[in-house]
């Protein structure tokens, strides 16, 4: 992606941030590009992430990449630029590495956005390129143990936290208070061509891309997170649910369904209604694949209902392989699964496809997770 014209460039080193209690720019707009840096400059509490993920056509292989600018992860390494690389293979083994880059550069231009996390001393660089309309993304891996490219081409439209298609003046990027989220690529076609420790991994399937940014640490803002991304037949379905830690008990969800690239359903309502569109989402149990955490979820069921338009969609997701798992104590943590999906409009054609799910629960008491809320 040639970046030939004037660009906004954010070039930071690993420990570069403002000192003390100083207000920094924190963008919450649902109009501007989701890819531009949202926090400028960094301070000691706020952080942001560019996330990319994908699942193979058979539902057995997956990847998740996280590009972070977040001082809250400094407790786990050195500096503010955490970068995580995760792959799950069909034989149920996994590859996982974390890097702490010395430098992060994000160039935001009219043709698109390019980010690079690099450490010349340790000999690695990881980068991404995203078109201005957020229809395509490329990720480039270059380290001693992971090399190659991942290409994602969207089959939907970028959406805000409340499910509106970008750009939208009446939309919100707030998942829960102080925690913001958007989905530049709800789902699309992915092509993976990488070498992991000299072993080739090549597959096609479904990919997606998320953006997260928060004024405080995830633990400060959240107690729970759940997500489903699936692509089947003409449909792309995305679901996210967040439970606030700052406003105890407050849960917000967002469900959007695309058909042939266009939105056909959106709702933030989690209770049944005779008038308003709503989505009932529940975990399912008793399947073959689960993780080691206390919650032995093996899939999801999603009921999307529009009383006014006489529409009712039902989708099922069943886990096929564990993509990643973080044990955070007290039997809880974060886990992600690749899997299979089926569903469609009730009484009409039904389809089969692939899915990625994620669930996160923070422990109630841990010395590693303390609130950094500042009034």
Curated annotation (Swiss-Prot):
Q: Which keywords belong to this entry?
A: Isomerase
Pathway assigned in UniProt: Mycotoxin biosynthesis
For this protein, the Enzyme Commission number is 5.5.1.-
Q: Pfam families given for it?
A: DA_C (PF22903), DA_N (PF24137)
Question: A GO molecular-function term, please?
Answer: isomerase activity
Q: What does this protein do?
A: Diels-Alderase; part of the gene cluster that mediates the biosynthesis of a family of the mycotoxins cytochalasins E and K. The hybrid PKS-NRPS synthetase ccsA and the enoyl reductase ccsC are responsible for fusion of phenylalanine with an octaketide backbone and subsequent release of the stable tetramic acid precursor. The polyketide synthase module (PKS) of the PKS-NRPS ccsA is responsible for the synthesis of the octaketide backbone. The downstream nonribosomal peptide synthetase (NRPS) amidates the carboxyl end of the octaketide with a phenylalanine.
Assigned protein family? Belongs to the Diels-Alderase family.
* Protein name (record): Diels-Alderase ccsF
Q: Which organism is it from?
A: Aspergillus clavatus (strain ATCC 1007 / CBS 513.65 / DSM 816 / NCTC 3887 / NRRL 1 / QM 1276 / 107)
């Amino acid at each position: 992606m040639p970046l030939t014209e004037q660009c906004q460039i954010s070039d930071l080193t690993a420990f570069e941030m403002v000192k003390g209690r100083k207000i920094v720019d924190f963008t919450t707009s649902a109009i501007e590009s989701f890819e531009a840096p949202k926090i400028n400059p960094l301070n000691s509490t706020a952080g942001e992430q560019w996330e990319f993920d994908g699942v193979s056509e058979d539902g057995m292989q997956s990847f998740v990449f996280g590009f972070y600018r977040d001082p809250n992860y400094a407790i786990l390494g050195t500096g503010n630029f955490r970068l995580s690389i995760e792959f799950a293979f069909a034989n149920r083994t996994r590859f996982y590495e974390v890097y702490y880059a010395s430098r992060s550069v994000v160039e935001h231009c009219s043709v698109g956005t390019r980010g690079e996390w690099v450490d010349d001393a340790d000999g690695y660089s990881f980068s991404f390129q995203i078109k201005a309309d957020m229809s395509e993304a490329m990720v480039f891996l270059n380290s001693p143990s992971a090399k190659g490219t991942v290409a994602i081409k969207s089959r939907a439209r970028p959406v805000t936290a409340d499910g509106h298609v970008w750009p939208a003046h009446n939309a919100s990027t707030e998942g829960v208070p102080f925690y913001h989220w958007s989905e530049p690529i709800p789902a699309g076609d992915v092509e993976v061509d990488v070498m992991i420790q000299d072993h080739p991994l090549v597959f096609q399937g479904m990919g997606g891309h998320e953006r997260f940014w928060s004024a405080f640490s995830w633990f400060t803002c959240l107690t729970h997170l759940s997500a489903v991304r699936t692509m089947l037949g003409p449909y792309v379905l995305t679901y996210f649910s967040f439970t606030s830690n700052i406003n105890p008990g407050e849960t917000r969800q967002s469900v959007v369904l695309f058909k042939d690239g266009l939105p056909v359903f959106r709702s933030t309502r989690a209770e049944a209604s005779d008038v308003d569109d709503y989505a009932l989402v529940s975990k399912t149990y008793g399947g073959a694949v689960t993780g080691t955490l206390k919650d032995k979820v093996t899939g999801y069921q999603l009921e999307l209902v529009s009383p006014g338009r006489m529409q009712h969609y039902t989708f099922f997701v069943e886990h096929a392989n564990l993509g990643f798992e973080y044990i955070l104590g007290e039997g809880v943590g974060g886990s992600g699964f690749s899997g299979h999906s089926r569903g469609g409009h009730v009484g009409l054609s039904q389809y089969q496809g692939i899915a990625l799910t994620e669930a996160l629960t923070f422990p109630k008491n841990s010395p590693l997770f303390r609130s950094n809320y500042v009034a």
